[in-house]
UniProtKB/Swiss-Prot annotation:
GO cellular component, one term: Golgi cisterna membrane
Reactions this protein catalyses: a beta-D-galactoside + CMP-N-acetyl-beta-neuraminate = an N-acetyl-alpha-neuraminyl-(2->6)-beta-D-galactosyl derivative + CMP + H(+)
Gene of this entry: St6gal2
UniProt-listed Enzyme Commission number(s): 2.4.3.1
SUPFAM superfamilies in the record: Glycoside hydrolase/deacetylase
Tissue: Mainly expressed in brain and embryo. Very low expression is also detected in spleen, oviduct, lung and skeletal muscle.
Name the UniProt record assigns to this protein: Beta-galactoside alpha-2,6-sialyltransferase 2
Subcellular compartments: Golgi apparatus, Golgi stack membrane
GO BP term, pick one: N-acetylneuraminate metabolic process
Residue numbers on the Lumenal membrane side: 33-524
Length: 524
């Protein structure tokens, strides 16, 4: 009898041990998971204002952060302006004083990143040879556990649309709903601490300062290389160009180009008489005097910039960004509207009949292969913008409506990459950057609002949608961070306007006085 009793006790102890392990595993799983975080789609990295998610449709942005945004009260804004990087809200690793001592905010090569990251990494730098190629293999999928990302396979969803999800799941929890310990140093340093914003204003930030989730998403797109980017460096990198030097280089190279119906396959499809007779670049041959580019960032709310915006000769807006109900902050005038291809392709946006897209100059775009192969693009666009374009042109033949040529879009990408010391995402620039360059080609002076965020910076993606995500400001699919750093170098406006209004002032290309020949003029 005793042996049986002993065996029974052993089995009971073993069962208790197994149940204990199971309970521990379940406890660890639920404590490490983040059920409040939205599941990301395969793109959805819409920039904060350029490729707008449209009204009534929510998206998930990969690399989304679940941190609270900066306080938007006047007192908080004043504190931000009065603060000094040597006494930041949450200091970055390394000595902040080095930023002020080094020219252009940089020390030298590897040391700059080493001091910020705490370890040496060469992955962000160009190789020594004159060209490099992005990897084009299938990347490893990340999982949405313990703060990581789960990225669907490239064929599952488009680069600009994610699954529609209940709105409440897309919103950040408010500060009052989270325990105090949730606001730890990881959250504050994630994307837009006071120190980070200060350095963004100075142009002294890098991707190594982004939170790990955005960095992971950026690495994903680096390895995926959907558009087949094969960048060849033609001359030395010019990340240290001065603002005037960079402006002259851009003036020499940037030529706004749209489909004119002369190239195959469009020439064989009868597009020549369909497109506007006057090219976009010649609509205002004498140039507009003063123009505004109004980003759709949530930070523009409570800005009272509407009257100033409407005072410009021309105003550019993006996608479905409305003015009705927001006139005090964004104004009412719209001259040009840049729209992504989803607006044309998705019937829910009522592109043909909506008043939002009437009585304005329309400029549409869709990502094409880096090779700018028009035949391949026509057969497989991200969204079929060609059919609705034809329908719109036939119904409203007098309205100026253009489709940007892929070569123009990728030319802008080349300029960003050549003037950036890091490898940037091999994806098209944001609509915001495209719009800025178009207006610099058409206007004598361009005022850009809330592209580089002001003290009102918030993770609210767009002023007309209750949707929060840090990736809207710093990007992950688009090379937004690098675009902003480049525009910061071009800014001729005041620091006060940048801080309080989020306003950057850029000269139009036609007003520049550049040397006839330049020693750096090595690009074709």
């Amino acid at each position: 009898m005793k042996p049986h009793l002993k065996q029974w006790r052993q089995r009971m102890l073993f069962g208790i041990f197994v149940w204990g392990l199971l309970f521990l595993a379940i406890f660890i799983y639920f404590t490490n998971s983040n059920p409040a975080a939205p599941m990301p789609s395969s793109f959805s990295f819409l920039e904060r204002r350029g490729l707008l998610p449209l009204q009534g449709k929510q998206r998930v942005i990969m690399g989304a952060l679940q941190e609270p945004s900066l306080p938007r009260s006047l007192d908080a804004s004043k504190v931000l302006l009065d603060s000094h990087p040597e006494n930041p809200f949450h200091p970055w690793p390394g000595d902040p004083q080095k930023w002020d001592q080094a020219p252009n905010g940089f020390d030298n090569g590897d040391e700059f990143f080493t001091s910020q990251v705490g370890r040496k990494s060469q992955s962000a730098f160009y190789p020594e040879e004159d060209s490099y190629f992005f990897v084009a293999d299938q990347p490893e999928l990340y999982h949405h556990r313990q703060g990581a990302l789960e990225l669907p396979s490239p064929g599952e969803t488009s680069w600009r649309s994610g699954p529609v999800q209940p709105k409440q799941k897309l919103l950040h929890p408010r500060r009052g709903s989270l325990p105090e310990e949730a606001y730890d140093s990881d959250m504050l340093s994630a994307s837009m601490s006071r120190a980070f914003l200060y350095r963004l204003w100075k142009g002294a930030v890098s991707s190594k300062m982004l939170n790990p989730r955005l960095q992971k998403a950026m690495r994903y797109y680096m390895s995926f290389n959907k558009h087949g980017v094969r960048f060849r460096r033609r001359g030395r990198r010019e990340a240290t160009r001065t603002g005037p030097e960079l402006l002259c280089e851009m003036r020499r190279r940037v030529r706004v180009r749209t489909l004119d119906g002369r190239e195959a396959p469009f020439s064989g499809l009868g597009w020549r008489p369909l497109v506007p007779g006057v090219p976009l670049s010649q609509l205002h041959p004498r140039g507009l005097s003063s123009c505004a580019v109004v980003m759709s960032a949530g930070a523009i709310l409570n800005s009272s910039l509407g009257e100033e915006i409407d005072s410009h000769d021309a105003v550019l807006r993006f996608n479905s960004a409305p003015t009705r109900g927001y006139e005090k902050d964004v104004g009412n005038k719209t001259t040009v509207r840049i729209i992504n291809s989803q607006i044309l392709a998705n019937p829910s946006h009522h592109f043909i009949d909506s008043a939002l897209y009437k009585d304005v100059i329309l400029v549409a775009w869709d990502p094409a292969p880096y090779s700018a192969n028009l035949n391949l693009w026509y057969k497989k666009p991200d969204y079929n913008l060609f059919t609705p374009y034809i329908q719109h042109r036939r119904k409203y033949p007098t309205q100026p409506f253009y489709i940007l040529h892929p070569k123009f879009i990728w030319q802008l990408w080349d300029i960003i990459q050549e003037n950036t010391r890091e490898k940037i995402q091999p994806n098209p620039p944001s609509s915001g950057f495209i719009g800025i360059l178009i207006m610099m080609s058409m206007c004598k002076e361009v005022h850009v609002y809330e592209y580089i965020p002001s003290v009102r910076q918030t993770e609210l993606c767009h002023y007309h949608e209750l949707y929060y995500d840090a990736a809207c400001t710093l990007g992950a699919y688009h090379p937004l961070l690098y675009e902003k750093l480049l525009v910061q170098r071009l800014n001729t406006g005041t620091q006060a306007d940048l801080h309080h209004k989020g306003k950057v002032v850029l000269p139009g290309f036609q007003t520049l006085r550049c040397p006839v020949t330049s020693p750096n003029n090595t690009h074709s």
